A protein has these predicted regions:
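N-terminal membrane-proximal hinge/A-helix region immediately C-terminal to the signal-anchor transmembrane segment
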Residues: 1-82, 94, 98, 113, ...
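Cytochrome P450 I-helix active-site segment
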Residues: 3-13, 120, 171-179, 229-237, ...
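Conserved cytochrome P450 K-helix E-x-x-R motif and the immediately C-terminal K′/meander segment
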Residues: 17-31, 35-37, 214, 218, ...
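Central I-helix of cytochrome P450 enzymes
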Residues: 148, 152, 212, 216-217, ...
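Cytochrome P450 heme-binding "Cys pocket" and the immediately downstream C-terminal segment
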Residues: 284-286, 392-393, 410-449
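C-terminal helix/juxtamembrane-tail motif
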Residues: 445-460
Length: 460
């Protein structure tokens, strides 16, 4: 007999809507995972959702022979902004395959390495500011948000914009960041709101969507009006590429969808670096180890692509930050539809779910599985270094999602994060303005530390 899946009791008709704060959805879910364990369920206005919070069960539900990505809830809501893009397309929509085949050649390891120099050109905008003078008070997340946008603009669209030092461009960059953060947060809240409230919020949702679509239109306009920008890059593929299977091209509206999707997806990398600054500020010995490794491998010159393969400890810092932060906090899974309506068994028959049950992986809990990590709550890069990283179960490394619907740009995101972190450590020293700052993070499709100010100085 299967074990009942635990969960908070809830109230009649409304279910568990009071157990999840819509303004802090992921913080609420993380607390429930700690309280109820590796699998639990809630009822939201009559809809049951099951949550997965350990490595063993995540390994089971990421088996693509049995389960697939579930496009539901907030992911459906953000289709208002990006329609049937790579991130939001339903499993049976042909548009996903067309866009994926057109874009995929520009997301390979080789293509990612080819744009390394673009990243290396942009990141000094950030490190020059942060190392300009001692004890500069900076909200790190703002600068990382816009340097991420600048890096996307150069890597994918061959457009060089200074969002750090140019006040006019910085304002545009921050408006774009605010729009996609606000739109995704609105998408997160809409499924659990009464319909009349969603109508009241619709004008704001429309405004943020318009900001993003207009920003993306300017990217396209700039390419068309500036022949010097032309090259065989992601934007060229979006505008001119032909799907080898269907011979179809993307409409301009679809190009806009994918440009916005790139920005929304890439935001995880900027948020990861904000967390890295936090954890290294709290763990100065690990920061010293990373700096010593960079000095040994790189010396006084610039960091190049070949150096990254030798910066093992710095990469472990990044991995450990990714583990603890779970900055892409979860992903949706459901059983693959079949003619059978029989319940689906999990955990070797220990649990039973309906045949069409949506599930959400809570990576904050998965990544702290005490059965896998010796120090689940502590920042210890050594536990994800070298063979220890290699020997971890695959389900303990799902920060970018799973299978064919995992993060499309994960190679670029990791290269950007790795190089940017190494550059920050090489060029600056830093500490939290408030040594007693307590980590508070929030977000929708990606989360980051809020209200965190850092004192940056040049590294001697």
């Amino acid at each position: 007999m299967p074990t009942p899946i635990p969960g908070p009791p809830g109230v009649p008709l409304l279910g568990n809507i009071f157990d999840v704060n819509p303004a802090e959805t992921w913080n609420s879910l993380n607390k429930l995972a700690k309280q109820y364990g590796p699998i639990f369920k809630i009822n939201a206005l009559g809809h049951q959702i099951v949550f997965i919070g350990n490595v063993k069960l995540l390994a089971e539900i990421t088996d693509e022979k049995r389960f697939r990505k579930c496009v539901t809830g907030p992911v459906v809501e953000i289709r208002y902004t990006v329609n049937d893009s790579l991130f939001t397309a339903y499993d049976d929509e042909k548009s996903w395959g067309i866009a994926h085949r057109i874009m995929a050649p520009h997301a390979t390891k080789e293509a990612t390495e080819q744009v390394f120099n673009d990243i290396a050109e942009v990141i000094p905008d950030l490190t020059k500011k942060w190392s300009a003078s001692p004890k500069q008070r900076i909200k790190a997340s703002d600068d990382l948000d816009v340097i991420l946008i600048a890096s996307c603009m150069k890597s994918f669209f061959n457009q060089r914009v200074d969002y750090i030092a140019n006040p006019t461009e910085r304002k545009k960059g921050l408006e774009c960041v605010n729009a996609f953060q606000s739109a995704t947060m609105e998408a997160l809240k809409r499924p659990t709101r009464p319909g009349f409230l969603n109508l009241l919020y619709k004008p704001r949702f429309s405004s943020w969507t318009s900001t993003l679509r207009n920003f993306s239109k300017e990217v396209i306009k700039s390419r068309k009006n500036t022949p010097d920008q032309s090259r065989k890059d992601m934007l060229d593929a979006l505008l001119n590429g032909v799907d080898p299977e269907t011979q179809q091209k993307l409409k301009e509206s679809q190009v806009i969808d994918e440009i916005i999707t790139i920005f929304i997806g890439a935001a995880t990398a900027a948020n990861l670096l904000t967390y890295a600054v936090y954890y290294l500020s709290k763990n100065p010995e690990e920061l010293k180890k990373g700096a010593a490794e960079i000095d040994s491998v790189v010396g006084d010159g610039p960091i190049d692509l070949s150096h990254l393969n030798q910066l093992h400890y710095v990469e472990a810092i990044l991995r450990e930050t990714f583990r603890l932060s779970a900055t892409a906090p979860g992903f949706n899974i459901e059983p693959i539809p079949s003619d059978s309506k029989a319940p689906v068994l999990l955990g070797g028959g220990e649990y039973e779910i309906p045949h069409n049950q949506p599930m959400i992986a809570i990576l904050n809990a998965v990544n702290r599985d005490p059965e896998v990590f010796e120090y689940p709550e502590e920042f210890k890069p050594e536990q994800v270094l070298g063979e220890k990283w290699d020997n971890l179960p695959a389900a303990a490394k799902k920060g970018f999602g799973n299978g064919k619907r995992e993060c499309f740009g994960k190679l670029w995101a990791w290269q950007w994060s790795f190089f940017t972190l190494a550059s920050i450590i090489k060029e600056t020293t830093f500490e939290l303005e408030n040594p007693n700052y307590e980590l508070f993070a929030n977000g929708a499709f990606s989360i980051k530390p809020l209200d965190m100010f850092v004192l940056f100085s040049p590294r001697k």
